[in-house]
Amino acid sequence: LGDVYKRQVIWQVENPDEKVLYFSIGGHPAFMCPVDEKGKQSEYYFKFDTDKDLTYGLIADDGQGLLGQEEDVLPVAEDGYAQITKHLFDRDALIVENHQASVVSLCTPDKKPYLTVSFDAPLFGLWSPAGKGAPFICIEPWYGRCDRTTFDGSLEQREYGNTLQAGGVFRREYTITVE
């Protein structure tokens, strides 16, 4: 049996002001995939703590960095695995909302998990630079995200935005496990 390493990442936001603070926070941790120079990313898998297909949103292609209206589905098998295909990230990040999963693992071609990110965030992103052949994939827990292309409201009305009262503290964490 190999060693297992865990790293806990803690986000803490404090509001020292007398006014309400509106904010979003998210990570951008990147993990090697493939784990050696011989393999291809498209031979690897995600494993989720669900056997339901994941619905995800896509960044609009207008260059503004906003969430478009289009959604797609990442097929998840009954055992929780989803193939990382060659063109999965061609249209930027996969934005998975509504607590559809809280554990995401990267798995070798023989479906053995080598890295797991566990979180209680309401949404997360999966990303690797499109068309660059980058040797990594990001698994990004988020408490908030970019606005939709159709949004024209205030900070108080943002989807997945967070509110912190005067003197309040927001504390969340996620865990990275390497096997």
Please tell me what each predicted stretch does.
Residues 11-17:
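Asparagine-centered strand-capping/turn motif at beta-strand->loop junctions
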Residues 149-156:
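Short, structured beta-strand/loop micro-motifs enriched in basic residues and often containing a Trp
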Residues 11, 162-178:
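Short Pro-Gly-centered flexible turn/kink motifs
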Residues 20-22, 30-119:
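Active-site/ligand-binding surface loops and adjacent short beta/alpha elements
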Residues 107-147:
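Glycine-rich active-site loops that engage anionic ligands at enzyme catalytic sites
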Residues 1-5:
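Short, small-residue-biased leader/transition segments that mark boundaries at the very start
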Residues 28, 139, 167:
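A residue-level signal for conserved active-site and pocket-lining positions in enzyme catalytic cores
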